[in-house]
């Protein structure tokens, strides 16, 4: 079953070897609001005008020594957007009118345009690369490691960076062993309650019922909360992979992404990821030849604050008014349409592929010690 994933990874890396340069335009919501989509399109027009080889998608047709012009998820430095990287050179507050100069000086001549570099207000030094910027220097990213780097709309690049290897491992060891790995990792719910994820999965798997469901809680109730939104937009496949692993472990037949309608870009990119998984054979019938059948679907939230609570979220997913229900019964016993249901937060699900790719012991190394241990910030 690993052959398909390994073949895609090998093919992508072979195609990517034809790329001479890469221009990454931040495609997070903040930068898009500042005009990054227009900047992205301007780079393509400038290359076309000059007759320079470029591509916006890594395929067999990529010409040697071409430039890959790609979008990324949020890079986390929204106040300085739109952000553009040309190789390691990191430009801030880029406008459409800057594109011609960037291509002429940076792409063709290798020169750095100082006025587009971030200036550290402490010492007034120009920061040439992202790593030179104090904001980034002490960050150790786990869930957000690929956000801002990979194209969130390209399943092949996600696989090229190790994506869906965690799913392969879970399918190989079986659902019970998958739950044991989760318990070893000591992952707790990242939505705030901190309930052990492996235990929640185990409860649902052992619950009686022919139909079981997974729900990803992508509804952030707090005004201005962008953590989950950044993950949904920037690395959607990490959450989709987590949902598939969770569905396999719990015996679910279907999973739902509950995402508020005010997050159109997150919805769009999750849908692109889901469609790509169906096309690749990672969703639907007989996934990777294992006999495991699983489907994913998006349900829109109306933006009600209370729908962040799991029983209200279940009601809303069913098409009812988002009203909390008394517990017990808990969702693991009687959830969506009265069937056993697991509800996990976006960050919880994005942690799952990391655990299976790196191993539960490696994941535990980033836990905060104490009685209520949990992963450090992303």
Predicted features along the sequence, with ranges:
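Feature of Fe-S/electron-transfer and energy-metabolism proteins
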Residues: 1-378
């Amino acid at each position: 079953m690993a052959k398909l994933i390994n073949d895609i990874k090998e093919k992508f890396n072979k195609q990517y070897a034809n790329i001479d340069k890469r221009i990454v335009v931040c495609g997070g919501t903040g930068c898009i609001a500042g005009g990054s989509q227009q900047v992205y399109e301007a780079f393509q027009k400038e290359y076309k005008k000059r007759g320079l080889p470029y591509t916006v998608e890594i395929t067999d047709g990529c010409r040697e020594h071409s430039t890959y012009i790609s979008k990324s998820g949020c890079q986390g430095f929204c106040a300085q957007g739109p952000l553009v990287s040309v190789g390691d050179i990191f430009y801030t507050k880029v406008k459409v009118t800057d594109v011609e100069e960037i291509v002429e000086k940076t792409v063709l001549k290798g020169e750095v345009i100082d006025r587009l570099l971030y200036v550290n207000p402490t010492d007034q030094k120009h920061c040439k690369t992202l790593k030179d910027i104090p904001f980034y220097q002490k960050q150790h990213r786990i869930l957000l490691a690929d956000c801002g780097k990979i194209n969130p709309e390209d399943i092949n690049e996600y696989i090229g960076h190790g994506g869906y290897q965690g799913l392969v491992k879970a399918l190989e060891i079986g659902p019970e062993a998958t739950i044991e790995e989760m318990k070893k990792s000591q992952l707790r719910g990242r939505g705030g309650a901190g309930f052990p994820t492996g235990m929640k999965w185990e409860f649902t798997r052992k619950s009686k019922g022919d139909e079981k469901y997974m729900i990803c809680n992508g509804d952030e109730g707090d005004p201005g909360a962008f953590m989950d939104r950044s993950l949904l937009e920037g690395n959607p496949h990490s959450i989709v992979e987590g949902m598939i692993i969770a569905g396999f472990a719990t015996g679910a037949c279907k999973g739902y992404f509950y995402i508020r309608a005010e997050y159109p870009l997150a919805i769009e990119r999750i849908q692109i990821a889901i469609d790509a998984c169906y096309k690749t054979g990672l969703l639907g019938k007989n996934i990777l030849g294992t006999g495991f059948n699983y489907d994913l679907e998006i349900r829109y939230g109306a933006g009600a604050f209370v729908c962040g609570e799991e029983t209200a979220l279940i009601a809303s997913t069913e098409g009812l008014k988002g009203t909390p229900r008394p517990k017990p019964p808990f969702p693991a016993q009687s959830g969506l349409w009265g069937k056993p249901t697991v509800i996990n937060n976006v960050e919880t699900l994005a942690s799952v592929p990391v655990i299976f790719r790196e191993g539960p012991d490696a994941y535990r190394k980033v836990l905060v010690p104490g009685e209520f241990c949990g992963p450090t910030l992303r």
